[in-house]
Amino acid sequence: MQTQKGGRPTILPKMYEEPLFSQIIDKIESGCNDREIYTSLHCSAKTFRKWRDDNIKAYDEAKGIARGNLLELAESALASKLTVRTLKETETIYDADGNVEKVKVKEKELDKDSLVAMMVAKAGNPELYNPTEWRRLQQEESSAHDLKAKIEELDDYKLSKYKTPEIEVPEGFE
């Protein structure tokens, strides 16, 4: 390590040289954040930022690779949840001597995850799968249905269905 005038030793010059340069880039590509890297190097955040700013092109390329890897991982996780899968549990029971007494195998079929399906569909067409809009439409539909039922109920009380009663005028009333 090199010492500066009046300061403590710094690792910065070694960070520009091989193999440390490649190791830092590999850590960035693997998805480590800046804090994890500079703490493992036992240097300050300011020292790491200086190295990062001097090597911004390599740093950005490594970050791009890390984002691509994370995106691939997320896509494969979503794809696995969009298929029917079987979960297999094996339980082994041993006797006192350590010999296998019984083996139980349970298989459980897990259905497609509807939340993941909605999320993927929403990513494809956000307007179509807007949950707020969906709830509003359901509420309008139910209130329209209730209104229709009330109108049909009021049809039973139409005046045209009633006959006007014949009222006799009392004597002495004119």
Curated annotation (Swiss-Prot):
Entry keywords, A to Z: Viral genome packaging, Viral release from host cell
Highest taxon, organism lineage: Viruses
InterPro entries: Terminase_ssu_Skunalikevirus (IPR010789)
Family stated for the protein in its record: Belongs to the skunalikevirus terminase small subunit family.
Biological function: Probable terminase small subunit. The terminase lies at a unique vertex of the procapsid and is composed of two subunits, a small terminase subunit and a large terminase subunit. Both terminase subunits heterooligomerize and are docked on the portal protein to form the packaging machine. Once the capsid is packaged with the DNA, the terminase complex is substituted by the connector proteins gp15.
Record's protein name: Terminase small subunit
